[in-house]
Amino acid sequence: MNDVITQLLRGTHEVLRLEELQKRIESGKPLRIKAGFDPTAPDLHLGHTVLLNKLKQFQDLGHETIFLIGDFTGMIGDPTGKNVTRRPLTRDEVIENAKTYEEQIYKVLCPERTLVMFNSSWMNAMTSADLIQLAAKHTVARMLERDDFAKRYAGGQPISIHEFLYPLIQGYDSVALKADVELGGADQKFNLLVGRHLQEIYGQTPQVVMTMPILEGLDGIQKMSKSLGNYIGIADPPDDMFGKIMSISDDLMWRYYDLLSFAPLAEVARWRRECSEGANPRDVKVRLGQEIVERFHGASAARKALENFEARHRDNAVPDDLVEQVIAVPDGGYPIANLVHDLALTASTSEALRLIKQGGIKIDGERLEDPKCRMTAGGTHIIQVGKRKFAKIRLTP
């Protein structure tokens, strides 16, 4: 296997089919590489960059890279992994969310070598007859091979007809673009294979499918998602970005190195070995935080974020021997006053509320000002009450 293929396989989950990818790379012909993103929220996060980084690798090798904004599919709602019908977005919501994407993706991709497209360009031109012909190219039985659809069907949960259209339209995007390679999350494998199937039907060479692992959020359990509050946005301020990375568990840190870092694999393996032999993983986490912040904000901002982080922790004199407590967060969030009381940091919730109003409670070194604040799942936090009471907590769903 040549060095280019080895580089492209780093961090991938699955390639269908590897021998096809090798032949196309070895042909020397520039390939059309497609990655699609539905504008379900206005901000991209580090989970999205797992795909963007792979797209950038192809871009650096001279291939044509297409960042496809699924403005049409966004109005259907991706049913992947859902046990209920997802609320479709309105046209206004889709347009508003998509506005920020181009600015954000250029923190990773080269603007001059990136083709940004919208799938409404061809889907809006499709007639009712065209759509029916497209629907005729797949069967209900094949759709029910999808794990999420199968579970909902077996459990008597409703599946709307428009949800069956989603994988067909995503697959048709590959036909419209004549994609050679499509990148997607591991949970998108079914949809990407529909693209291969449709390309064959339309007389095209089927695309190679490359799936990437799903990045866990700050809680280390669920997929990184803005709706779950467990995300690190690529537009987050440097201090916030660095602080969030420093809040993740040591185990999750290695996962982030695997999927987000550009550090040489040999170095990461050495750091992992040293930590297993007693080295402090905090130092390795600092390296990760510095690398990520520098990528999106520059070296100066990364240094400043580290200085600010260390100053906050030095001034707060957080004990080194704090034992991490795992706290389950109820639906709707954990009211901070209740949480502080439940951690035995105050004698009552009313005392906690009084201390918040007096500025006597800090979270991760920042003074808490909102007594109605609710903590959501995701990450590890230090809660400080007064000068001497501390708790280290990891919030899970």
Curated annotation (Swiss-Prot):
Chain ranges for the short sequence motif 'HIGH' region as given in the UniProt record: 39-48
| Annotated S4 RNA-binding domain residues | 334-395
As recorded in UniProt, its EC number(s) are 6.1.1.1
Q: Please give the biological process terms from Gene Ontology that the record holds.
A: tyrosyl-tRNA aminoacylation
Q: Where in the cell is it found?
A: Cytoplasm
**Superkingdom:** Bacteria
Q: Name one Pfam family in it.
A: tRNA-synt_1b
Query: What PANTHER family does the record tag this protein with?
Result: TYROSINE--TRNA LIGASE, TYROSYL-TRNA SYNTHETASE
Q: Give the function comment from the record.
A: Catalyzes the attachment of tyrosine to tRNA(Tyr) in a two-step reaction: tyrosine is first activated by ATP to form Tyr-AMP and then transferred to the acceptor end of tRNA(Tyr).
Entry protein name: Tyrosine--tRNA ligase
Source species, please? Methylococcus capsulatus (strain ATCC 33009 / NCIMB 11132 / Bath)
Native organism taxonomy: Bacteria, Pseudomonadati, Pseudomonadota, Gammaproteobacteria, Methylococcales
